[in-house]
């Protein structure tokens, strides 16, 4: 029994030494894990939430919807265009309630996921949501910007779980293009 434990302990030490060598080698070479982990499936989660993605068409001005640089994808600002093609418009604190702003931000999240699906071909390639910059068309005395942009963040966390939690800014704007209620930019990290 004693010799079996010693043999097992020896194998563990050798195994740990091998793992340590591999970690050190990876740190020296800059190698990172680029494989999508088993069981990670934002596409299936999206379906289970009943969220349907939609075509985003071409940009309305001289820009592109997304730019990939290395393992980061930068998304242009997107508005709350609904499935019927209409934008949710108005100023928070004057024309729209916090709840309506939350719903507008949720629509933006669906639109950004649609852009990512078109850009990447598969939402399962998204490693994590890195940064969200939410802009709220708000009256000067409106102060609940975070509650509005929660509509966006809540979708990302619902779809990507812990990987959907992100750094964020939620700021008020005097106006947004076309009087849309909310505009959001996003940065995501992807698996190669």
What positions do the PLM features span?
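Short, polar/acidic, helix-capping and beta-turn segments at strand->helix junctions
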Residues: 17-192
């Amino acid at each position: 029994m004693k010799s079996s434990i010693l043999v097992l302990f020896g194998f563990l030490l050798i195994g740990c030494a091998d793992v340590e060598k591999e970690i050190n080698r990876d740190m020296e070479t800059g190698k990172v894990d680029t494989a999508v982990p088993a069981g990670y499936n934002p596409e299936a989660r999206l379906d289970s939430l009943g969220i349907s993605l939609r075509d985003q068409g071409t940009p309305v001005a001289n820009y592109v919807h997304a730019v990939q640089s290395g393992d980061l994808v930068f998304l242009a600002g997107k508005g709350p265009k609904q499935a019927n093609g209409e934008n949710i418009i108005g100023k928070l604190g004057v024309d729209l309630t916090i709840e309506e702003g939350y719903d507008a931000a949720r629509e933006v999240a669906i639109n950004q996921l649609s852009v990512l699906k078109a850009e990447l071909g598969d939402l399962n390639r998204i490693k994590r949501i890195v940064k969200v910059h939410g802009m709220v068309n708000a009256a000067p005395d409106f102060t609940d910007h975070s509650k509005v942009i929660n509509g966006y963040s809540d979708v990302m966390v619902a779809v990507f779980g812990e990987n959907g939690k992100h750094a964020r800014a939620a700021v008020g704007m005097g106006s947004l293009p076309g009087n849309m209620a909310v505009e959001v930019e996003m940065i995501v990290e992807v698996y190669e």
